[in-house]
């Protein structure tokens, strides 16, 4: 079994003479009305796990002008974001919703030569729209998809029960069908690429709470932007995400009541400890 362990993940290196441009730029797109927190969590996770520049883009009309806790995060409208040329990775899906605007934005970014992390409602849109599905399959640059079992079932026109009973086979099928790296979330997350797979052994039931998936997508975007290839970014991100939850539980911060925001800060602590 190909398990992910501390000795086979890659941590981004920080040079003493580095500047913020060396650590990549990542944008997080989503946050429709009622779901702004998803983008907030993902963008904070991207920032705190090392991205040099982080942009947050909300679909909601009631967009915050600044994240008061992390004013380092730059807020841009979805239209303004399209003109940014220095993006190293785009995360699309957290709180995106299923509107026509969401579908149009997803179509735009699927057509761009920039690495994508595709999560949540972006996956639901792809599952329900052949045009979007084909755009993903035809991409020539990095794509990481991060479905939970329900989203995976929709992408494969299957049932969640079947996904859970055949997790490795399902992850491989998703990776092959959509020409992407698949991060099939859940207990023992499976990461699949073409004909290979890896199983994560970190994490616990504390991660079964709102927002932890958004945190993971932000972490993955951050690691890709910092220069890790998509497979290594996925392995490292999933391992650290789960290990952060394990570390918190060891301190009696969870599993009951463990929050996504707590995972972000613990992930930073672990990344620095592994440098």
Language model regions located:
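Small-residue (G/A/S/T)-rich helix-start motifs and N-terminal tracts that mark the onset
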Residues: 1-117, 124-144, 149-275
């Amino acid at each position: 079994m190909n398990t992910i362990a501390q000795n086979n993940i890659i941590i981004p290196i920080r040079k003493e003479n580095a500047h913020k441009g060396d650590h990549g730029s990542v944008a997080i797109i989503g946050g429709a009305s009622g779901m702004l927190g998803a983008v907030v969590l993902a963008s904070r996770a991207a920032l705190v796990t090392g991205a040099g520049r982080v942009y947050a883009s909300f679909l909601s009309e009631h967009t915050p002008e600044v994240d008061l806790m992390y004013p380092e995060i730059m807020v841009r409208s979805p239209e303004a974001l399209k003109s940014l040329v220095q993006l190293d990775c785009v995360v699309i899906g957290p709180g995106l919703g299923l509107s026509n605007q969401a579908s149009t934005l997803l179509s735009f970014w699927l057509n761009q030569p920039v690495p994508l992390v595709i999560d949540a409602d972006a996956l639901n849109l792809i599952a329900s729209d052949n045009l979007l599905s084909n755009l993903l399959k035809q991409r020539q640059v990095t794509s990481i998809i991060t479905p939970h079992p329900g989203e995976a079932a929709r992408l494969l026109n299957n049932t969640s029960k079947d996904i859970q009973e055949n997790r490795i086979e399902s992850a491989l099928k998703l990776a092959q069908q959509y020409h992407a790296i698949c991060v099939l979330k859940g207990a023992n997350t499976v990461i699949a690429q073409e004909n290979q797979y890896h199983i994560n052994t970190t994490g616990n039931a504390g991660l079964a709470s709102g927002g932890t998936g958004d945190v993971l997508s932000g972490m993955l975007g951050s690691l890709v932007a910092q220069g890790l290839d998509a497979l290594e970014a996925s392995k490292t991100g999933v391992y650290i995400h789960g290990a952060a939850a394990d570390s918190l539980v060891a301190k009696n911060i969870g599993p009951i009541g463990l929050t996504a925001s707590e995972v972000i800060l613990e992930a930073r602590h672990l990344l620095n400890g592994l440098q």
